[in-house]
Structures are given as C-alpha cells and as structure tokens.
Amino acid sequence: MRGILITIEGINGVGKSTQAMRLKKALECMDYNAVCIRFPNPDTTTGGLILQVLNKMTEMSSEQLHKLFTKHHSEFSAEIAALLKLNFIVIVDHYIWSGLAYAQADGITIETKNIFKPDYTFFLSSKKPLNEKPLTLQRLFETKEKQETIFTNFTIIMNDVPKNRLCIIPATLNKEIIHTMILTKTIKVFDNNSCLNYIKMYDDKYLNVQDLNLFDFDWQKCIEDNNDKEEYDDDDGFII
C-alpha cells in the first residue's frame, strides 16, 4: 500500500496553483494526508535561482536553466518517495511534463533519471493565460509566441500519457467545476491505488515503495527493473 502522485499541468497562468492548493485543503478536510509541492520551490537554493532567472533578475543560458530545473525536480524525489511510503496524496504543481514541454520549446533534451511518472495527471488546457500580463510584467517563457509553442508541446506529450492516467480539462471552465472534477477523480485514484506497492519511474524502472525503510533511508536501493509490476488501472480516463 502506498500514497499517490498527482500532477497538475498546463502553461503559465491557467490556474494550476489555485487548483493544487484547493485540492490539498479539500483532501485534508476529508481526513486524507495530502501535501502540495510547487516547482520552482523558492525555499531551496536551486528553486530560488530558477525564480531569479524566470523573473529576469539573473541571466542564464537556456541549456543551463533546463538542467537546473531537472536537478530541482530530482532534489524532491527522496521526499516524494517518503511521502508515498507514508500514504500521502502528493500533489505537484509543474512536474515532469512541464519540464519536457518547456525544454522542447528551446530545442533541448533533458535528463529524466530519478523522476517518477505520475499516477494521474490533470492538464488544464488553454493556449493562453486566463489573464494575460502586461509585457513589462511577463516572466521568461510568458510571451504569447513561447506559450503557444509550449502548449503545442504539451498536447503532443499528453497524447503519449495513457488515457487511464489523464484528464484534460478546459482551463476556461468554472473554477468550482474544475475543482470538483479534480477532487472526485483524485479520491477515486487513491482508493483504487490502495493495493499497489510500486510506482513507475520515467526510465521505466520501478520504485518498490513497500520496501522503503524510513529509518535507514536510501530510496535508490529500492529501484527495480521493469518486471511485470502491478500498476494503477482505471478505465475512466477522460477528456472533456
């Protein structure tokens, strides 16, 4: 038995952070253990540096920035593994699919070692932000042209995500409707996931969550080759 890893994805400005925090609060009110991780995380040295680059306070090459993002994602893998062991619902705002979509917009291939594949992904679909910022306030990657390229990359990536692990939601829907859809589906995924001990990694290896020892913690020792491990299965993956 383990927790689940949920990601909320989409271009900047479509309400991901709002929905992630609402989901966490709603789950906690229903007595689920839930945690929300947002990338980039300003509480880490790597995350703080990334935010400086995104806010145009520090210059860095595109290749260096995407490598830094990859490192930043990997920094949280041990924490995510421990939370899954403790049966938490881990909600991630911007994760592997964002890393791929944004890197591809700059023609860069990123390293995906030690990154988990989400149990379920909610993609808030929109080609442009719900409230566009003035040009002077736009972060790196927030120009109209760049966001359209990133959206196109997202749609290609989402086509490769198994449909039983994906919900594509128009970001322009009423926020309450989006929240209800995400909450209902997350609970179902958690309930259906209760018998699983493994989580798949991006390189198609598996982390044996059941064998993790939180007192002598070396999560990478529990990574195993693909060997017909059981996986979450749900025929209700849907697109609206």
Curated annotation (Swiss-Prot):
Cross-referenced SUPFAM superfamilies: P-loop containing nucleoside triphosphate hydrolases
PROSITE patterns hit by this protein: THYMIDYLATE_KINASE
GO MF annotation: an example: ATP binding
Record-level GO BP terms: dTDP biosynthetic process; dTTP biosynthetic process; dUDP biosynthetic process
Pathway: Pyrimidine metabolism; dTTP biosynthesis
Enzyme class: transferase
Family: Belongs to the thymidylate kinase family.
Role: Catalyzes the conversion of dTMP to dTDP.
Protein name: Thymidylate kinase
Species assigned in the record: African swine fever virus (strain Badajoz 1971 Vero-adapted) (Ba71V)
Lineage: Viruses, Varidnaviria, Bamfordvirae, Nucleocytoviricota, Pokkesviricetes
Gene designation per UniProt: TMK
